[in-house]
Amino acid sequence: LANVGNEHYRKLTHGTGFFRYFFNKLKEGATGNGPIKRMFITGVSPVTMDDVTSGFNIGANMSTDPRFNGIIGFSEREVRDMLSYYKDVDMLAGEVDEVIGVMKPWYDNYCFSRDSLHEPMYNSDMVLYFLNHYLPLKKVPENMIDNNIRTDYNKLRHLIRLDKKMGMNASIIQDIVTNGETIGTIKTAFPAEDLAKPDNFKRLLYYFGLLTIRGTKWGSILLAIPNLTVREQLYSYLVEAYRSADLFSLEMDRLGMLVASMAYEGNWKPVFEYFASELKRQSSIREFI
């Protein structure tokens, strides 16, 4: 969908398309005395569930089953046990609580069921990335985010539908970045033609790991940014969106130096003067203002 568009997607997933054929063969192999007795399928998006597995009625969707909330990722107890082991063998430079305090805001707070709010999970890939740097070098990595876990912006470009008005989905990302959370519902399946609808866009952000379940509000699920790693990703998506739509552009190296000067030396005025001058120069961006 993101790379080659709807027509190619439909050829794969409808009629005699390869993807649908593959799932039909799985069903055939698991029926009666077929060779497949058990299967566990991961990475199946809600779009796949609707468009490909409509006849695949031999399985159960466990995505939001609280019994499987901890199947992938590390609980805090598991992270502490791991750190305690390295501390006992003199490989951990800091104290366990100190290291947890560094990792938690960046890697924790994933929840996949409203009944598992007491059991937030750490992203295991990011925890191992951190330890792979921290243990041998005895210091926190300069970059807390592993580039391998970044969701490809091109996967969202198709859904944001960038144009001169930016589209509603880009506004949803902007609102989520501003407030840190949004109200939504989670569906296990919806068709590709409904993919770009605002409600489904929120659901897809959840399935991409960019939102997580924080609780309930007004009878709906409260979806929130889980940690600083994801917040940084969403900021970068907004920057890419503005650049791609040619609505607003900034010289990022210059802005970075101005922000650093504000942070370390208290020179706040040049930052806002730069913003003001660019807003004036790029006067066609009323949506941004």
Q: Where are the model-predicted features located?
A:
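Short glycine-/polar-rich loops that comprise or flank the Walker A/P-loop
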Residues: 35-38, 59-62, 66
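Extended alpha-helical interface modules used as scaffolds for assembling large macromolecular complexes
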Residues: 59, 121-289
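Conserved P-loop NTPase "ATPase switch" module shared by AAA+ and STAND
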Residues: 1-12
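Amphipathic alpha-helical segments of the small helical/lid subdomains adjacent to P-loop NTPase cores
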Residues: 46-54, 62-132, 175
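Phosphate/oxyanion-binding active-site loops and adjacent basic polyanion-contact surfaces
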Residues: 11-19, 75, 201, 289
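Substrate-engagement module of ASCE P-loop NTPases
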Residues: 11-37
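Beta-sheet entry/capping signal
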Residues: 36-41, 45-48, 104, 118-119, ...
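Flexible loop/turn segments at secondary-structure boundaries
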Residues: 2-4, 32, 46-52, 213, ...
